[in-house]
Design a protein with these regions (language model features):
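Conserved alpha/beta-hydrolase "nucleophile elbow" surrounding the catalytic nucleophile
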Residues: 27-29, 89, 93-95
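Catalytic active-site module of serine/aspartate enzymes centered on a nucleophile-bearing elbow/loop
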Residues: 244-275
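Conserved HGGG/HGGXW glycine-rich cap/lid loop of the alpha/beta-hydrolase fold
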Residues: 10-63
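Conserved alpha/beta-hydrolase "acid-adjacent" motif
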Residues: 227-233
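Short beta-strand/loop motif that positions the catalytic acidic residue
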Residues: 214, 220-222, 226
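Conserved alpha/beta-hydrolase catalytic His-Asp/Glu region
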Residues: 125-128, 132-137, 147-212
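Flexible "cap/lid" loop of the alpha/beta hydrolase fold
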Residues: 102-151
Length: 275
C-alpha cells in the first residue's frame, strides 16, 4: 500500500499486492479500493499481481474540489500505472470504474500498456437520456440523486446499499448486512464535493468514441437485474461499439453482482484472464 502525488498535487492511495501478471481494479461510485478486497485476495491466490486504488476524492485519496471529471480520472490512473511500471496489465472496472477504464484504455492504453479490459455493470456508452440516447435515464433521476445527497449524504448512502445496489429490495432477497455496512463505511470516507461532482461525471460523460478506439479484448459483463445502470442502455450497446468484445449477461444478478455472486463472477473473470 502507498500513495502517489499526481500533477495537481492530489494524493492517490493504492494497494499493490503480489507478483505475476498485473490486474488493476477500478471501483464504482462512491466507494474505494476496498470494494474489491474479495477479488484482490482471490486473484492474489491465483498467482496474479493485484492493484486497486481510491479515485481522487474517494476513500483515502485526497479531497478533490475541482477536476472531478473522467479525463482527470484517466490521467490519474495513467500516473499510477507509470509509477508502478505496469505493462500489459488487465484493467477491470465496475460501474463508474468501467467508465474510467474505458477512457483510460482509449487515451493511455496503447503501446502494450493494456492487454485486456473488463467492463462490469459499467456506465458506457452514456447513462443520461437525450435525443442521441433515447433509452437513457431521464436527467430527473440524477437531479433526484443530487437532492437526496444534499439532504443527507449518510441516509442516501444507506438507502442505496440496503436497496437497489445489491438487489436487497427485491421480494425474498436476503440482506447481507455486512455488505451494506461496508458500502456505507467506504462511501462516507470520501469527500462530499468530489462525490457530488461525480454524479454529473458518471451520468453525462459520453464514451461512444472511446469505445470505438479500444483495440484490446474486452469482457462486457452485466447483471440483468441491475437497478443502477439498466442493462438495456449499457452493456449491449457498448459491446457493439467495441472492436473485440465478449458480452455476458447474468439473469437476475444485481448491480453489485461481484459481491453477491463472487464464485460465478470470479470464475468468469479468471477464464477471461487466462484465455
Amino acid at each position: 500500500m502507498g500513495t502517489i502525488t499526481v500533477k495537481d498535487g492530489t494524493e492517490i492511495f493504492y494497494k499493490d499486492w503480489g507478483k505475476g501478471p498485473a490486474i488493476v481494479f477500478h471501483h464504482g461510485w462512491p466507494l474505494s479500493a476496498d470494494d474489491w478486497d474479495s477479488q484482490l485476495l482471490y486473484f492474489l491466490s491465483q498467482g496474479f499481481r493485484v492493484v486497486a486504488y481510491d479515485r481522487r476524492g474517494h476513500g483515502r485519496s485526497s479531497p478533490s474540489f475541482t477536476h472531478n471529471d473522467m479525463d482527470t480520472y484517466a490521467d490519474d490512473c495513467a500516473a499510477l500505472v507509470k509509477h508502478l511500471g505496469l505493462k500489459g496489465a488487465i484493467h477491470v472496472g465496475h460501474s463508474t470504474g468501467g467508465g474510467e477504464v474505458t477512457r483510460f484504455v482509449a487515451k493511455h492504453g496503447g503501446n502494450g500498456v493494456v492487454s485486456k479490459a473488463v467492463l462490469m455493470n459499467a456506465i458506457p456508452p452514456v447513462m443520461v437520456k437525450s435525443d442521441k440516447n433515447p433509452g437513457g435515464l431521464p436527467i430527473e433521476v440524477f437531479n433526484g440523486m443530487r437532492a437526496s445527497f444534499i439532504r443527507s449524504r449518510g441516509q442516501f448512502y444507506r438507502d442505496i446499499a440496503s436497496g437497489p445496489f445489491y438487489g436487497f429490495n427485491r421480494p425474498g432477497a436476503k440482506v447481507m448486512q455486512g455488505i451494506v455496512d461496508d458500502w456505507w463505511r467506504q462511501s462516507m470516507m470520501g469527500d462530499a464535493k468530489a462525490q457530488y461532482d461525480c454524479i454529473k461525471t458518471f451520468s453525462e460523460t459520453d464514451f461512444t468514441e472511446d469505445l470505438k478506439k479500444i483495440q484490446v479484448p474486452v469482457l462486457v459483463m452485466h447483471g440483468e437485474d441491475d437497478q443502477i445502470v439498466p442493462v438495456a442502455d449499457s452493456a449491449p450497446l457498448a459491446a457493439k461499439l467495441l472492436k473485440n468484445a465478449t458480452l455476458k449477461i447474468y439473469p437476475g444478478f444485481p448491480h453489485g453482482m461481484f459481491a453477491t455472486h463472487p464464485e460465478v463472477i470470479n470464475a468468469d473473470l479468471l477464464a477471461f484472464f487466462k484465455s
